[in-house]
């Protein structure tokens, strides 16, 4: 912020890495985990996402969504306000990666 680092790189690494042990999650949720305040993609293919593994994300009730994909050097923020249309985020993600040739 204003040229000053607020968080150490090590802190960001902890916050954006899975903090939940595999045995603590039901089987169907083994493709993603949880960092500190974010979801973490552990197996993007299994999640049917274009994002790279270890990308992190979160979404809201009205289809707001952000994700950070370090593997592809990409940050996406969607601030739509549409209730009840969960599949639109998947379509938007595919379009973003297709447009970028990823």
Give short role names for the model-derived ranges.
Residues 1-102:
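Catalytic loop of the DD-peptidase/beta-lactamase superfamily, centered on the K-T-G motif
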């Amino acid at each position: 912020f204003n040229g000053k680092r607020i968080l150490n790189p090590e802190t960001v690494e902890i916050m954006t890495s899975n903090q939940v042990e595999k045995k603590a999650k039901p089987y169907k949720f083994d493709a993603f985990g949880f960092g500190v305040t974010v979801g973490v993609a552990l197996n993007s293919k299994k999640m049917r996402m274009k994002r790279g593994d270890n990308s992190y994300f979160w979404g809201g009730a009205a289809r707001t969504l952000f994700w950070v994909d370090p593997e592809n050097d990409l940050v996406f923020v969607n601030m739509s306000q549409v209730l009840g249309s969960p599949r639109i985020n998947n379509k938007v993600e595919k379009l973003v990666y297709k447009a970028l040739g990823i």
